[in-house]
Amino acid sequence: LLDGFPAIWPCVQWHGVHVAELPDGAVNLAASARCSVQAARFAPRAWGIQGHIEVEPHTVRDWAAIPAYRHQLDSLQGEGAIDRFDAEAARNMELFQALSERLYRNLMAVSVS
């Protein structure tokens, strides 16, 4: 699933609930300092990804337009969090787009194998 991905890759992480422990037999494919399970394989054709690489230039602002989401980020990261988060996403946008395309191609390949 992550064939062709760099060893370390950025993602947008904005979730209140996350998988922290995998069931027996599942394989942890990616982790980060903030989330011990970023991607996992649960069965030969069942995967999960928690970090977002499928973002577009407006994604952070769109999510921030939802009051509960904005409040959550502000309470965790402080004033100006949206601007910092949006700027960080913008810096990585080209890589996000390349990784999203790679992930799509990988999903198509493993779905038919």
Question: What role is predicted for each listed range?
Answer:
Residues H58-S113:
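Acyltransferase
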